[in-house]
């Protein structure tokens, strides 16, 4: 009797492997639950939401130092001051920082490329704004 049970179990296991039937695939087949549809509709990506709100400009409250590389004269010193000096209520708040005359000129030159939205936890956790771990 014990051998019969072992053989039946082995046969069932082999059939399941051959036919590709598993617990995950069985669960994947039953995704017609209305609760899952509601949960999927509520999922949103904080980074994408911020990009849409910023309207193509760089958001001073949610970008890292490396984003300033595209503006000559801002990376790394002025960019670090700006990132560490936030959060800001307006782009002009950057001018309240302790900046040299040259740094003020450089910021004024590129000021139209920036905007300010509320800081988002998903984009400001840890030290990612200072060092995002991307190296050349």
Curated annotation (Swiss-Prot):
Keyword Transport: yes
Membrane topology: Peripheral membrane protein
Keyword Membrane carried by entry: yes
Signal peptide region: 1-28
GO biological process: photosynthesis; photosystem II stabilization
UniProtKB keywords: Electron transport, Membrane, Photosynthesis, Photosystem II, Signal, Thylakoid, Transport
UniProt xrefs under InterPro entries: PSII_PsbU
GO cellular component: extrinsic component of membrane; photosystem II oxygen evolving complex; plasma membrane-derived thylakoid membrane
Principal subcellular localisation of the protein: membrane
Location in the cell: Cellular thylakoid membrane
Function as written in the Swiss-Prot or TrEMBL entry: One of the extrinsic, lumenal subunits of photosystem II (PSII). PSII is a light-driven water plastoquinone oxidoreductase, using light energy to abstract electrons from H(2)O, generating a proton gradient subsequently used for ATP formation. The extrinsic proteins stabilize the structure of photosystem II oxygen-evolving complex (OEC), the ion environment of oxygen evolution and protect the OEC against heat-induced inactivation.
Family designation: Belongs to the PsbU family.
Quaternary structure annotation from Swiss-Prot or TrEMBL: PSII is composed of 1 copy each of membrane proteins PsbA, PsbB, PsbC, PsbD, PsbE, PsbF, PsbH, PsbI, PsbJ, PsbK, PsbL, PsbM, PsbT, PsbX, PsbY, PsbZ, Psb30/Ycf12, peripheral proteins PsbO, CyanoQ (PsbQ), PsbU, PsbV and a large number of cofactors. It forms dimeric complexes.
Protein name (database record): Photosystem II extrinsic protein U
Species, as recorded: Synechococcus elongatus (strain ATCC 33912 / PCC 7942 / FACHB-805) (Anacystis nidulans R2)
């Amino acid at each position: 009797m014990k051998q019969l049970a072992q053989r039946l179990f082995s046969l069932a296991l082999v059939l399941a492997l051959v036919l590709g039937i598993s617990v995950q695939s069985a669960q994947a087949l039953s995704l017609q639950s209305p609760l899952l549809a509601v949960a999927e509709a509520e999922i949103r990506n904080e980074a994408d939401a911020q990009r849409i709100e910023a309207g193509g400009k760089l958001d001073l409250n949610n970008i890292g130092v490396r984003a300033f590389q595209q503006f000559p004269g801002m990376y790394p010193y002025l960019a670090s001051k700006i990132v560490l000096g936030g959060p800001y209520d307006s782009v002009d708040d950057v001018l309240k920082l302790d900046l040299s005359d040259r740094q003020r000129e450089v910021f004024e030159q590129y000021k139209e490329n920036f905007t300010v939205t509320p800081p988002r936890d998903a984009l400001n956790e840890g030290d990612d704004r200072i060092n995002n771990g991307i190296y050349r």
